């Protein structure tokens, strides 16, 4: 009974599996029943294993490798299973564990569970158990314990562990070896047996990176494929160096997949396993699984993904709306279609069979990918309109399939009345009222009538108009696609009545009313309405005329003199020119002036060539230019011209400004007499001499002259542009002797006409001897030669002279406000003179000026703070100077070529747009322009610094020539200079002097005293400027302290009259000036401020 029970128990466990606790068997037993046993060398021993099921042995040596080991089964009558292991001729290699276990409990992956006994076979010649092939390699996880398996054949043997000759402390067990935490490297075990020392071979310890948990990630590029495509799946293991990874997939049986391993060590350890299945078929659909197992620990992780393979691509669409849809007018509505497709589809929308444009703002389409093969397409109506009604179609297609869906959309529009009019039937008095309405759905039209016109504000006075009323006919509505028209006819209207048209549909009801007037009353109303309309037209016409008259541009002088500045520097107070005194010394008799041809004409006045008699001692007859207003000038314009005269009298003379010579203000129109400039304005001169410049500089490419508005191939056009500037208000070339207009005036008989007058002595620069290789070039710059050849040095000379002239104006706190090449004239000897030529320019028809209120502004020349903040300072003139440089080195080009002055232009200026370098400018010159165009005014250079910068670009001989000419000008009896001095001979008649030096001192004192008395009527209190130290005075140029003046003008508006000697000027030069009776300070007149 006991035997059969044991057999039944074993069979039950075999059938149900070893994992059930109810089938758990007792472990087999080993005889002898000991944990360990020592066996003599070369002796024999046997071990018996007894168990309730079939048992087997595990031992150090396999039966195939060792014939001295024999395992056999024995039968007994107890029903137990017995297996005997017998070893003959035992050796040290038989030392180790012997385990007896049940066969049914053992699998390939599980550890052996059973009874164990350890056998020692001491061998005096072999202290350590022989090692296997892999025993010398010890793999351990980082910071984990490990066993170095140097086992001894005798349990009594003492063993030590060494690492590179160093003793390593560690716990030792003769059945396992040394146990502990070891660093990476070689280790040797050493034992001494009966005086003999035994050493093992090296044990190499390797540390591998591993974690307690496997971090496994699976990635499939896609999960849907077509037949013939390649399936790619990857699994990545992180932070583990030794991992066993197995793939399970549908094609594994056919060995179809290709596996690859890639190791990535940076920034962290990563093992990437890739499975590739080429030429996939439908059979390759299914689950793809990767299972990773750690090499040093019993840790496993698994990931899987489902992949489907289709014979061909597919498209499926699922709309979320019906085939008939309606939206309300101005409603925002989305129509969503769910799409599933592979490969990636192309989705398009059509309206009434026409493709919708993607950039429409009222109807938009959008496609979003939600999953690998799932998409969502949206058609969005933004504020739906009536014309949005129609048939909409979505088409989804790829290379293998196509699907579409169409729906009809209607826009529901509330009823509205488009028109309500009455038609008269002639003298019979009959009238027909037509009411046109629209809406979706089409509205219905009803009629109502109110016979008591005064009570029509009350709804109870209205009655529905029946179709069977006598003398009234109601017609059926005429229906269109979205409009309907209803009519009602009245045979005769004898009194005023009101008719109401009602249009209604499901969305709204609207009404409109119309009065029907009897024919007699209508004629009376028509006459009254006509009179009223005529009266309104007259009133509006008068208003328009007044506005036009007030907006008519008025002449005003652009120059302004700064009186004071607010502490924050954002508000400037300018001197009122009318409050300035006018010195009668400037008055010139009218009978001494003969007027000739017109040099320039504008909307307000003109400039005329004239001949002045007795203007100076050295030149009794002088050619001059005369400014005057037109006979139609208004009083405000006369006042502006007088203001210009007063400002010029107080500025004083300078070589590089158009100097005032005299004026006629009494007994007739105001004449301002100024210097006559031989070559006219600078723009004209640059245009005219462009070809000569290009011939001297062949390295400059002759590009299209678009910036000039010229066609280089059309000589007639170019000639016209150069020679016809009188018509558009520019200063005419004074060398021309063509037939021009003349101003009739008294002509003195005893003198020749203006054409025979000799040139002014002050217009002819002094000659000088050739001193260097550059003298010939400099001589062409400042000479009396009529040659008009233009060179790069000429352009630099113009640039320098304008800077000097503007430096002088800045020293007087004078802001020009219209600095441009058209306001720069060229005198004999190519002397540049700055002027304000707005009086003789037709600015209303000049494209360079833009209308703003009642004035015209040169916007392209203006600084940003002047354009946007109406702020004009010397530093805003610096900006204009940069534009002027661009004009000069583009040979008269128009700034910002091709750009209109509009909102785009203003936005570009605000955003920092600047012009590129003109063709003929050097990098140094362009750098000056860029500095002048700094958006922050305080960072722009002053005219003093600009003069110094340009001066350094010119030959040294040029500087000396210029200073000599400037000095000669100030020493001459030029009317502009002479009138600012007191005639010493007249002032001190009868006084005897010991020497000329005493006479000069008294003359200077008299001049200063007279100056103070002349200006005492108008003195503006401004803070003084610190005097220049004597040490610095020797290194500065002879100027009116313009640098100090310009910089301080930003804060105080003050100026200084300190005399500063130039670098290239000698003390002898100043003494020579003193000898001729000129105070050194007279070189730069004291500001009237």
UniProtKB/Swiss-Prot annotation:
One GO CC term of this entry?
plasma membrane
Indicate, by first and last residue, each region the UniProt record lists as having compositional bias (Acidic residues): 1065-1089
Q: Could you tell me which residues carry Phosphotyrosine?
A: 572, 574, 720, 731, 742, 754, 762, 768, 849, 988, 1018
For this protein, the Enzyme Commission number is 2.7.10.1
Q: What class of enzyme is it?
A: transferase
Induced by what? Up-regulated by growth arrest.
> Per its UniProt record, what SUPFAM superfamilies does this chain match?
Immunoglobulin, Protein kinase-like (PK-like)
Q: Which residue stretches does the UniProt record annotate as biased composition, category Polar residues? A: 1041-1059
Domain Ig-like C2-type: from-to ranges: 25-113, 117-201, 202-306, 319-410, 414-517
Glycosylated residue positions: 42, 76, 89, 103, 179, 353, 359, 458, 468, 506
Q: What happens when the gene is disrupted?
A: Embryonically lethal. Most embryos survive up to 13 dpc, but display important defects in skeleton development, including spina bifida, fusions of cervical vertebrae and ribs, and incomplete fusion of the skull parietal bone. Embryos display also abnormal mucosa lining the gastrointestinal tract, including fewer and misshapen villi and loss of pericryptal mesenchyme. At about 16 dpc, embryos display extensive hemorrhaging.
List the signal peptide residues.
Answer: 1-24
| List of catalytic residues | 818
PTM: Ubiquitinated, leading to its internalization and degradation. Autophosphorylated on tyrosine residues upon ligand binding. Autophosphorylation occurs in trans, i.e. one subunit of the dimeric receptor phosphorylates tyrosine residues on the other subunit. Phosphorylation at Tyr-731 and Tyr-742 is important for interaction with PIK3R1. Phosphorylation at Tyr-720 and Tyr-754 is important for interaction with PTPN11. Phosphorylation at Tyr-762 is important for interaction with CRK. Phosphorylation at Tyr-572 and Tyr-574 is important for interaction with SRC and SRC family members.
Quaternary structure annotation from Swiss-Prot or TrEMBL: Interacts with homodimeric PDGFA, PDGFB and PDGFC, and with heterodimers formed by PDGFA and PDGFB. Monomer in the absence of bound ligand. Interaction with dimeric PDGFA, PDGFB and/or PDGFC leads to receptor dimerization, where both PDGFRA homodimers and heterodimers with PDGFRB are observed. Interacts (tyrosine phosphorylated) with SHB (via SH2 domain). Interacts (tyrosine phosphorylated) with SHF (via SH2 domain). Interacts (tyrosine phosphorylated) with SRC (via SH2 domain). Interacts (tyrosine phosphorylated) with PIK3R1. Interacts (tyrosine phosphorylated) with PLCG1 (via SH2 domain).
Q: What is this protein called?
A: Platelet-derived growth factor receptor alpha
**What species is this protein from?**
Mus musculus
